From Swiss-Prot:
Belongs to the universal ribosomal protein uS14 family. Keywords: Ribonucleoprotein, Ribosomal protein, RNA-binding, rRNA-binding. Part of the 30S ribosomal subunit. Contacts proteins S3 and S10. It comes from Synechococcus sp. (strain CC9902). GO terms for biological process: translation. GO terms for molecular function: rRNA binding; structural constituent of ribosome. GO terms for cellular component: cytoplasm; small ribosomal subunit. PROSITE patterns: RIBOSOMAL_S14. This is Small ribosomal subunit protein uS14. It comes from the Bacteria. The keyword RNA-binding applies. Binds 16S rRNA, required for the assembly of 30S particles and may also be responsible for determining the conformation of the 16S rRNA at the A site. The keyword DNA-binding does not apply.
Length: 100
């Protein structure tokens, strides 16, 4: 189980990324379309003025059951240990143990 403070920090980052997503994407579009170096510099400063935690790259992919940050399967949102346990119990619909 991950520390609750780390899970809370990640939740805070997700909310902040949602809040600033439209503004960040508009600034990025303007930055990519600007031809003048001075206007690009000005737009870049505006992007840098946004909060760091509003960047989607700072969001960590975590297991929703345990909060573990590593070994998380995107399709299920579970870490490998929880995926194995729940698959054996039959709690994941459509997951079948392979045999060949």
């Amino acid at each position: 189980m991950a520390k609750k403070s780390m899970i809370a920090r990640d939740v805070k980052r997700k909310k902040m990324a949602e809040r600033y997503a439209a503004k960040r994407s508009a600034l990025m579009a303007a930055f990519n379309s600007a031809a003048d170096p001075m206007s690009r510099l000005e737009i870049h400063r505006k992007i840098q003025a946004l909060p760091r935690n509003s960047a989607p790259t700072r969001i960590r992919n975590r297991c929703w059951a345990t909060g573990k940050p590593r070994g998380v399967y995107r399709d299920f949102g579970l870490c490998r240990n929880q995926l194995r346990e729940r698959a054996h119990k039959g709690e994941l619909p459509g997951v079948v143990k392979s045999s060949w």
